[in-house]
């Protein structure tokens, strides 16, 4: 099926937009020297899939993915006690975009690096937001950029199930 001309023009307009018109503001961040458990708690409270990581001087150290933290938190508690957020970041420098860059540039960068989200830096080099693949798709669909404050987001579903009831008669003993 051939694409209609107005659809093609819309796509070109979206790709030519600057990132700041499509991204969402960074409402929640995590310090690079925080523990992995603190990062997990922030993910749970915010309901986000990505957390920007900032260094003590305010520079962006990268973007933490919820799945990476979930894998790390599956480790024994002893191993978790010394695990820092910065340890969870991938070994290379952060993949970032700047507010004045185009959506096309960001989409190309995300495709080449295999990421589904990137931190967005302002003109001063400080973190101003996060751009996700969902944000780009929403822009193509004509939806406005999302600006959900953390307190208006639906609560994240609980990740821990209640413990199973005790077994009765296990190995010849009964639970009172």
Tell where the protein language model's regions lie, with residue ranges:
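Tandem CBS (Bateman) regulatory domains
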Residues: 2-25, 65-115, 127, 132-176
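Generic detector of bulky aromatic hydrophobic side chains
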Residues: 14, 22, 38-40, 44, ...
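Short active-site-adjacent helix-start/loop capping segments
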Residues: 38, 60-62
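Short hydrophobic/aromatic beta-strand element in the GNAT-like acyltransferase core
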Residues: 50, 60, 117
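Short, conserved beta-strand edge motifs with alternating hydrophobic and charged residues
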Residues: 52-54, 63
């Amino acid at each position: 099926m051939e694409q209609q001309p107005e659809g093609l023009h819309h796509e070109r307009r979206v790709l030519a937009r600057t990132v700041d018109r499509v991204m969402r503001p960074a409402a929640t961040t995590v310090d690079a020297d925080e523990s992995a458990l603190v990062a997990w708690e922030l993910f749970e409270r915010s309901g986000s899939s990505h957390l920007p990581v900032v260094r003590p001087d305010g520079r962006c150290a990268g973007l933490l993915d919820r799945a990476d933290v979930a894998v790390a938190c599956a480790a024994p508690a002893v191993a978790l006690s010394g695990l820092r957020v910065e340890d969870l970041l991938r070994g290379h420098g952060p993949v970032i975009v700047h507010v004045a860059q185009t959506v096309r540039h960001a989409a190309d960068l995300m495709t080449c690096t295999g990421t589904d989200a990137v931190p967005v830096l302002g003109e001063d080099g400080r973190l101003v937001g996060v751009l996700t693949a969902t944000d780009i798709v929403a822009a193509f669909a004509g939806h406005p950029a999302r600006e959900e404050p953390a307190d208006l987001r639906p609560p994240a579903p609980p990740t821990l199930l209640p413990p199973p009831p005790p077994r009765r008669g296990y190995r010849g003993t009964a639970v009172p």
